Amino acid sequence: MHNNEDWKHDANKLTEEMLELASELVKQYNKPHKDYHSKIQDEIADVSYRLNNMIEWYDTKAMAQRMVDKWGVDEDVI
């Protein structure tokens, strides 16, 4: 486990953004007559930014291999 304060900050911020995205997705699911597209799009962008920060803490080759093994994703795409 990482005890680094920077890792903790990145992990916390990513978690917050993922929860916000989940909240908007649930709202859209529960209220299909309303349009949450813009809010969902914004939250996806926020999650993407924070996820890219977290990726720096981990073995990207191992993650790429996981994607190939689990989903058959072409390594050139990763």
Please give the residue ranges for each predicted region.
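Flexible "arm" and connector segments at domain edges
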Residues: M1-I78
